[in-house]
A protein has these predicted regions:
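Glycine- and aromatic-enriched membrane insertion/assembly motifs of diderm outer-membrane
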Residues: 104-137, 331, 336-337
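Outer-membrane beta-barrel pore domains
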Residues: 55-56, 100-103, 147-159, 258-268, ...
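Outer-envelope exported proteins of Gram-negative bacteria
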Residues: 79-85, 128-134, 180-182, 231, ...
């Protein structure tokens, strides 16, 4: 049997223990009365990412204007922002069509952007002005150099939109309602007019069927996730006001949006120039556009249909186009992006909207981009394959080639 060890405690020791316990307990009670040490201060919140106060230019990406933009206070006019771009372009292509426009040779290069953007973006009265030089390059179409596009109303390009391609005044009595008028960017399509605004350097086959700049007026209204715009303009910059265009956009969340656009000529227009092609300017056009934009992806598929009604006193039988495109950009990081576009367009009817009645075309474009602050550079390779072409209306010196490959390099500053 295990023995239990007896512990003897004297009265004095027991009293001392009680005294010690009492002192310790009282000391503990005193500690509980002391104020608690204040918690360490919370770290300051990270600075908010700058948001763009700019009206325009609209930029899909991956190129970005550095924020905050330069701002100047001009007395009673208030705060005015000034931005701009300067860039050069070199292009090499197979099967050029040299007899369409001067300089449309196997290779071309030079200044393709030298523009300044000035705008006031708050208050009741606002405005946007874009001025300078630009070139236009789009898939399957002749390259329009800066001198042809910008200078001289008698140039073969018809001067396109001149040295002042876009600019408008805007009245905004509330945050969700505004009216604007002037030389407006079109509501139609998923690609913008100038190359720096888009994922790719060249605009696509579908863009070739769309108006780019129109003179007229536009009303804008937003309510919650819905945004509406309605414009009355001269369509393909014809100088004849007979185009009505509307757009409706639903923003599901910051990453996802859906847009429907419809527009068309309410009458007929007899003008036929490079910037106002007679068939397209007498057409109606429809878009369905979905946009996903959340790092590291931009994904934008869209569908487009156009129709030109018959007018035998003006241009002849009817014709239509139908097509779709997928625009994609992936942000690799450290300033590098990889962009691409896949598209197809087909035509029906007995009039020529592409490379002859009933012709079609497929395209593939790849555009790597690097931007460090204001400096950017990007390259591009594109391929177009046409089908069911009419002799003399496709590629090459005789207009009978059915493919065209292009290599492009662009570099400059965007500030």
């Amino acid at each position: 049997m295990k023995k239990t060890k007896k512990i003897a405690i004297s009265g004095a020791a027991f009293a001392g223990a009680l005294l010690s316990f009492g002192v310790a307990g009282a000391w503990a009670d005193d500690l509980t009365q002391l104020p608690a040490a204040p918690p360490p201060p919370a770290p300051p919140p990270p600075p908010a990412a700058p948001t763009s106060p700019l009206i325009a230019p609209a930029i899909t990406g991956p190129l970005t204007i550095q924020l905050p933009p330069p701002k100047y206070t001009l007395g009673p006019l208030g705060d005015v922002y000034v931005d701009g771009i300067g860039s050069g372009l070199y292009q090499w292509q197979t099967n050029p069509v040299p007899n369409v426009l001067p300089g449309n040779n196997r290779s071309a290069g030079g200044l393709n952007n030298g523009q300044v953007f000035v705008q006031k973006t708050d208050g009741l009265f606002q405005f946007y002005a874009q001025a300078g030089a630009y070139a236009i390059t789009s898939l399957g179409s002749p390259f329009i150099s800066t001198p042809l596009a910008t200078w001289g109303a008698n140039s073969p390009a018809g001067n396109l939109w001149g040295w002042f391609p876009q600019g408008f005044a805007k009245i905004a009595p509330t945050d969700n309602f505004s009216v604007e008028g002037g030389k407006l960017p079109t509501l139609i399509g998923a690609e913008y007019t100038f190359d720096f605004e888009n994922i790719n350097i060249e605009r696509g086959l579908l863009w070739n069927q769309e108006p780019s700049v129109s003179k007229g007026g536009q009303v804008n209204y937003t309510r919650g996730p819905l945004a509406f715009s309605l414009s009355f303009t001269d369509g393909f910059d014809s100088g004849v006001w007979n185009w009505l265009t509307g757009s409706a956009t639903y923003t599901l969340n910051p990453a996802n949006s859906f847009e429907f656009v419809a527009g068309g000529n309410l009458g007929s227009t007899h003008i036929n120039t490079l910037r106002t092609p007679i068939l397209q300017n007498n057409s109606s056009i429809y878009n369905l556009i979905y946009t996903y934009n959340a790092d590291p992806w931009i994904i934008q598929p869209y569908f487009q249909a156009t129709h030109v009604p018959a007018n035998f006193g003006l241009y002849g039988p009817s014709a239509s186009t139908f097509g779709g495109a997928l625009l994609v950009n992936y942000d690799v990081g450290a300033g590098f992006n990889l962009g691409g576009r896949l598209e197809y367009i087909g035509t029906t009817g007995n009039n020529n909207l592409l490379y002859g009645p009933g012709s079609g075309a497929f395209s593939l474009t790849f555009t790597p981009t690097y931007q460090y602050r204001y400096f950017f550079t990007r390259g591009e390779v594109s391929f177009v394959k046409a089908n069911s072409v009419a002799d003399g209306l496709a590629f090459g010196s005789n207009g009978t080639a059915t493919t065209q490959t292009r290599l492009l390099v662009e570099t400059g500053i965007l500030f």
